[in-house]
Regions:
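Non-catalytic helical/linker scaffolds that mediate oligomerization, partner binding
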Residues: 4-267
Length: 267
């Protein structure tokens, strides 16, 4: 373990009595805070856990943070834990050469990514089962809910949609399918590489994104056991399926995080 930080107790003085703060403060470490001095100041201010978001950080970035935390934890009563947060499976729009300006009422088509299928006002999506799972009358949200579509009709390879909330669409924007059970792996190839990296560097926790069912947690636990890692498992609840199964997921996890952004869109 990086720090033994899973048993942190942080005594504070309140009304002349020594108190134990049970609520932990988790801080996401980004470009503005990724330095030894900044981490030291954050620890002094009360940070308990340094979160590394692997959706944005490289393994090289993460290794620097882990080493700084280990240095801070040397000979300290209250060590910081390191939490490695996986990117998880994602549905995204494709690459486009120029941003698309979408106005409310515009008609566009959404299709599974295919370089052979090109038409004006067509948006490619990297989820093979898109056309199969979305129903006419359903909604699709893009770019964290900034752009919304209503499905008007569908055929074998595309969805014809009306823009409900317009905006400027760029490349590789996040797509949500509210209320739909998606068929995506619990642990992607990138996640596997990042988890193995975390095990090699003794992180304290692995946060698994888009946990939908108890089997997702068990899959991660088997992987950690195979690497002889003692890292705790934090399950991130990000869609309706995860909410439905949250009690069984929580029973298998060391912690649960509610991803309010994605969950707010999905539900």
């Amino acid at each position: 373990m990086t720090s033994g930080a899973r048993s942190i107790v942080d005594p504070k003085i309140c009304n002349g009595r020594r108190m134990i703060r049970r609520t932990k403060i988790i801080c996401t470490i980004g470009p503005a805070t990724a330095s030894y001095d900044k981490l030291k100041a954050m620890k002094k201010a009360g940070m308990d856990v340094a979160r590394i978001n692997m959706s944005h950080a490289t393994q090289r970035d993460a290794l620097k943070i882990i080493r700084w935390v280990k240095k801070l934890n040397h000979n300290t009563l209250f060590p910081i834990a390191v939490l490695l947060d996986t990117q998880g499976p994602e549905i995204r729009t494709g690459e486009i050469s120029d941003p698309m300006n979408l106005a409310t009422g515009d008609i566009v088509s959404l299709s599974v990514r295919d370089d052979r299928f090109v038409e004006q006002n067509s948006i490619m999506v990297n989820y093979d089962e898109l056309v199969d799972v979305v129903k006419v009358g359903g909604t699709i949200t893009v770019d964290n809910g900034l752009i919304n579509f209503k499905v008007l009709e569908k055929d074998s390879n595309k969805l014809t949609c009306e823009v409900l909330d317009g905006g400027t669409l760029g490349s590789r924007k996040h797509v949500n399918l509210p209320g739909i059970r998606v068929n995506l792996p619990a642990i992607t190839g990138k996640d596997l590489s990042d988890i193995e990296f975390g095990c090699e560097n003794d992180v304290d926790y692995i946060a698994l994104s888009f946990v939908r069912k108890p089997e997702d947690v068990l899959e991660l636990k088997r992987l950690l056991a195979s690497k002889r890692s003692r890292a705790g498992v934090v399950a991130k609840i990000e869609d309706q399926e995860g909410v439905t199964n949250v009690n069984r997921i929580a029973a298998l996890s060391d912690g649960v995080m509610v991803a309010r952004g994605d969950l707010g869109i999905e539900t």
